[in-house]
Each structure stands twice: as structure tokens, then as C-alpha cells.
């Protein structure tokens, strides 16, 4: 579940805006068991699991898998202090499958802190893009494009694992 109703509203607004040809999944923990791939022996019997995201420990507020099987992470920040706290964490928002990272903000919070946010991003994460959501979640705008990372396409087994997580979460959201 989202940390706040405002975060959930932003997740849904972005998903509605981008979701037509994309897979949008909220609150994905990249911990070891969140995305495991079954391994089968020659006779088809399950012999264990592989963990393609082993060692990754962060949680993404929203992930977006495009129709070409590239993953973009969207970090939703509803306060300036939450945004700053992101840069104090050891774990960064990157996996071998992460092609891009956006920060999403409510319009009013972004406008109030725009220059400070821009300065932090230039210094700490210049590749990140910026999305703002305003008017009760009805308006979604990309105001800074991302710089893409050299990333692997998501293998079908990992994509299915992430979609399973999404199916377990979206139905819980209520506005």
C-alpha cells in the first residue's frame, strides 16, 4: 500500500496517463523474494528458484514497463524532506533492468521548492526526470526528460513476477 492517500492518488494519475500501452505496478519491493524465477529440472519438476534482483533492497513507488520491455522507476515525493531523504539512502534506484528514473511531485509542492529540487538533482542525480501531478491528479506533465541508462530488457520470467506483484496490489487501492 502507498504511504499516503496523496501518494496513491499520484500513482493512479501517472498510471492512467502512461498506462495505455505500458504495465504500471505500484510499491514494488526489490527484495529477494519479490521476484523469483522458478527453475525446473529436465523432467519439468521444480528444483528451486533464481533471484534475478538478488542484492537489491529498495522499494519503488511505481514501476513502468514499456512495450519494449524496459523498466522505468518513478519515485513519488510528497514533501521536500522526503525528497532529500532519498539521497541519504545507501541503496540507489537502479537495477540491471532500470533504464530510467523519474521523480514525481505534487504540483504545489514542486512549485514551492522548484529551484531547490533542480539544484539537488543537478548535483546528485542529473539523469533523473521530473513529473508533476496537479489539479487533484487530473494533470500529469513530464517537465524534465530522463537520460537513459544502458539497461537490459526485462526477461519474461521477471516481467511475469513483477506483474504478479502488481495484481496483488492494485485491487487494494481505494480513493
Locate each region found by the language model.
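Non-catalytic C-terminal interaction segments of nucleic acid-processing enzymes
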Residues: 1-26, 33-36, 117-175
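Short, isolated positions within intrinsically disordered regulatory regions of eukaryotic proteins
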Residues: 68, 111, 174-175
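Active-site metal-binding core of divalent-cation-utilizing nuclease and nuclease-like domains
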Residues: 2-73
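Intrinsically disordered, low-complexity segments enriched in small/polar residues
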Residues: 49, 100-101, 146
